[in-house]
Swiss-Prot record:
It comes from Pseudomonas fluorescens (strain SBW25). This is UPF0260 protein PFLU_1520. InterPro entries: Puta_zinc/iron-chelating_dom (IPR005358), UCP006173 (IPR008228). Pfam families: CxxCxxCC (PF03692). Belongs to the UPF0260 family. It comes from the Bacteria. PANTHER family: UPF0260 PROTEIN YCGN (PTHR37421:SF1). NCBIfam families: PRK05170.1-5, PRK05170.1-6, PRK05170.2-5. HAMAP family: UPF0260 (MF_00676).
Length: 149
């Protein structure tokens, strides 16, 4: 009988993933591409419903992923070396889960094989976001959806 092989996200730490494995951890929820506000009093970070100008509001995918940092200089590029800072990511995020040595949820495409499951389970923000160009930045506070961490 063949030994059961654990999935790469269980077997490996983030630092040992190859580029394809790293990119595949993204579940496509779009949450990391929402604009965030920081409370000046306690440094808490809050997610808004306001999406980055490059985010497709339906698919929750970046419309110019390879060049995103040229268009959006403050775009956050996640790397394995930042794992200790992933607490701001949603608790469902594959990067955060693997960095905390947890398994991926059943709806994650690497588990279920369906990239649309994140939308069907309403984990993603598909259909619930606004484009950053449609809301004045001074009004973003009116669109808070949850606190990070």
């Amino acid at each position: 009988m063949a030994a059961k092989v654990e999935p790469f996200w269980i077997r490996k730490t983030l630092e040992h993933l190859d580029q394809e494995e790293w990119e595949s951890l993204c579940d496509g929820c779009g949450l990391c591409c929402l604009q965030k506000l920081e409370d000046e009093d306690d440094n808490s970070v809050y997610y808004t419903r306001i999406a980055c100008k490059l985010l497709d509001l339906k698919t929750c995918q970046c419309t110019d992923y390879p060049n995103r940092r040229a268009s959006v200089p403050d775009c956050i590029q996640l790397t394995p070396g930042q794992a200790d800072q992933f607490k701001w990511l949603p608790p469902t995020c594959g990067y955060r889960l693997v960095s905390e040595r947890n398994d991926l949820p059943l709806w994650h495409h690497l588990v279920c094989g369906d990239r649309d499951a994140v939308h069907h389970e309403r984990i993603s923000q598909s259909g619930r976001m606004l484009s950053e160009g449609s809301v004045p930045e001074d009004d973003w506070e009116d669109y808070l959806i949850f606190r990070a961490g």
